[in-house]
Structure formats: C-alpha cells, structure tokens
C-alpha cells in the first residue's frame, strides 16, 4: 500500500514531468539495527513499480496487497487502482480495468460490507478470515469511501448517508463532530492511537460533494482548534494553543 501511494503520484500525469520514469528514480532503502544484517536497497521507477504492484495483486487473487504481514485492508488497495489508472493513461493500457474486475469479484465473495452495513476492514492473507468494522470506527468507512469514490462512486454514494448518520454528532450553530469509538483491543491490551477519524470524515464529505456536512465539520474545527497559519486559515492543530506565525 505504501508503495502504491508513491505509484499514484505519477509526475507525468500531475506535472508533465518524466523524472520518475528513469531507472532507479524511485528507490527505497531499508535498514534496522533491531534486526541486523546489511542494508537493503530496492531500485524502481514508475514502470517497474507499477509492474511489481500488479503482480502482487495477481498473486493474491486480486484480493489486494498486504500493507502489514498477512493484513489485506480493503482501504489500502485503492491507491494502487488509482496508480494503475494513471499508468494506463500514459501507456494506453487496460491494466486498471483488469484489476478492478478481479478486485470486485474477490471482495464480492468476501463481502464488501459487514452485517452492520459498514465496510469490512480487512482479510487475513493466510486464513482468509474477514475482519468487520465491529467498533464502527469512523476512519474505516471514511477512508475507504473517500478513496473508493474515485472508481466506484455509485456504490459509495448508495451507502454513504446511512454510514455517515451513525458517526456524526450535531453541535451548536450547525457544527458537526464525529463519535469517538472505544479503543481497540489486541492481544489482551487496549490500543489507543490517533486514527484521524475527524480528518478522514471531512475528506469523505468533500470527495462525495456533501457541502452541508463538510461545512458543519469545518465549523466544529474552527470553534475548537486554532488556525496554524495566517495565509491558510483552514489548517488546524488541536495541540497548538495559539496560531502559528
């Protein structure tokens, strides 16, 4: 998934710049003193990276590419699909169409939605067990819906109103906030982290074109968090007590 985010930033499409088509232009270096061993260098360019991600999709049966070991999140494969679409624009190919057809069938078999109508979070690559969004975490629906909207808009818009209604909290003066789900438990411990629920719901509303919801969310942000820049009033930081200079 992380490589797919890089793949989707094809400069040829965005800026008419071919720098990342050069061999080795997209190279990844990895070394950790915790594990020992020599540093590893992975040289790619936009074409070889596209090829690498494509074959990972094929080998998985089009379920997707695991972004953590054996964890194939439904969310995390939409950047790859976007990258395939942009690569097809450059090459005249049809790889995105093939991948989407296989991906749709694979997730139709597993179930794109859980019994509660929320997006299933992930499939385990080894056991093929489906993990639902049992806690109704806003980030799961919002992140998945935001990214899937660029190629599967009718499906996303069909389920958006009901999914959204379960996570919004109305406030004063039209403000809208987002419910805070209970912490996830893993191996007997509670995991508390910032999953960016509010931010992803704002992105989701923006991608859908839901101006009323987006305005309500931005109203909440304006009244609870100070701005971080004089030239960018719509950037907020809840940890900054005063505006940044």
Task: Annotate each language-model stretch with its function.
Residues 196-227:
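Extracellular low-complexity, Gly/Ser/Thr-rich intrinsically disordered linkers
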Residues 5-13, 47-61:
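Long, hydrophobic/aromatic-enriched structural stretches that serve as scaffold segments
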Residues 221-243:
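Conserved blade-ending motifs and adjacent loop-strand segments that build the rim/top face
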Residues 33-44, 48, 59-63, 67-196:
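Extended ligand-binding clefts on enzyme/binding-domain cores
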Residues 12, 105-108, 222-226:
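Amphipathic alpha-helical segments of tetratricopeptide repeats
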Residues 4, 54, 104, 145, ...:
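Non-transmembrane alpha-helical segments in soluble domains
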């Amino acid at each position: 998934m992380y490589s797919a985010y890089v793949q989707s930033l094809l400069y040829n499409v965005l800026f008419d710049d071919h720098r990342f088509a050069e061999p080795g232009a997209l190279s990844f270096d990895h070394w950790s003193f915790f594990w020992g061993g020599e540093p590893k260098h992975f040289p790619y360019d936009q074409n070889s990276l596209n090829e690498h991600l494509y074959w990972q999709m094929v080998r998985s049966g089009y379920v997707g590419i695991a972004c953590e070991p054996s964890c194939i999140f439904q969310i995390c494969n939409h950047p790859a699909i976007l990258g395939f679409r942009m690569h097809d624009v450059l090459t005249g190919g049809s790889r995105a169409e093939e991948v989407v057809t296989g991906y749709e069938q694979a997730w139709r078999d597993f179930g794109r939605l859980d019994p509660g109508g929320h997006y299933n979070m992930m499939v385990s690559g080894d056991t093929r067990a489906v993990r639902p969004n049992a806690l109704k975490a806003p980030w799961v629906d919002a992140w998945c819906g935001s990214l899937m909207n660029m190629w599967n808009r009718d499906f996303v818009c069909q389920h958006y109103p009901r999914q959204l209604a379960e996570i919004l909290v109305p406030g004063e003066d039209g403000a809208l906030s987002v419910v805070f789900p209970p912490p996830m438990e893993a191996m007997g411990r509670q995991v508390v982290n910032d999953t960016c629920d509010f931010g992803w719901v704002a992105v989701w509303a923006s991608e859908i074109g839901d101006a009323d919801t987006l305005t309500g969310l931005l109203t909440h942000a304006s009244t609870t968090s100070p701005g971080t820049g004089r030239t960018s009033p719509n950037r907020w930081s809840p940890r900054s007590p005063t505006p940044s200079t």
